[in-house]
C-alpha cells in the first residue's frame, strides 16, 4: 500500500514516530529510516500493514516501511 501524510512524534516517554494521512488516519511506523524521524515533514510511504505486531503506543495500525519519498 502507498500512503501520503505528515510525520508526527506520538506518545509518552521516548514516543514513537507516526504517519498521519490527509484524511486523519494514523499509522505507527516500523523500520523507519532516520530521515523519516523529523516531525512535520510531508512524505509518501510504501509499505505493508503488520497485523502480527503489537506495540505499547497503540496509536494505529503498524506500517512497515518498505520505501519512501519526501514531498
Residue map of PLM features:
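Structural detector for short beta-strands of small beta-barrel domains
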Residues: 1-13, 46-47
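Well-ordered beta-strand positions in beta-sheet-rich domains
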Residues: 2-4, 26, 62
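Short solvent-exposed loop/turn micro-motifs enriched in small/polar/acidic residues
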Residues: 10-12, 28, 61
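Short aromatic-glycine-enriched beta-strand elements
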Residues: 13-19
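Short, structured beta-strand/loop micro-motifs enriched in basic residues and often containing a Trp
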Residues: 21-28
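Short connector loops at helix/strand junctions that flank enzyme active sites
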Residues: 22, 38-42, 58-63
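Short nucleic-acid-contacting surface segments enriched for D/E, G, S/T with interspersed K/R
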Residues: 32-46
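OB-fold/S1-family single-stranded nucleic acid-binding modules
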Residues: 52-71
Amino acid at each position: 500500500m502507498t500512503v501520503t501524510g505528515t510525520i508526527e512524534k506520538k506518545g509518552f516517554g521516548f514516543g514513537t514516530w507516526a504517519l498521519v494521512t490527509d484524511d486523519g488516519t494514523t499509522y505507527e511506523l516500523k523500520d523507519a529510516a532516520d530521515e523519516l524521524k523529523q516531525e512535520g515533514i510531508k512524505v509518501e510511504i510504501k509499505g505493508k500493514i503488520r497485523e502480527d505486531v503489537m506495540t505499547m503506543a497503540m496509536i494505529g495500525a503498524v506500517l512497515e516501511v518498505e520505501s519512501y519519498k519526501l514531498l
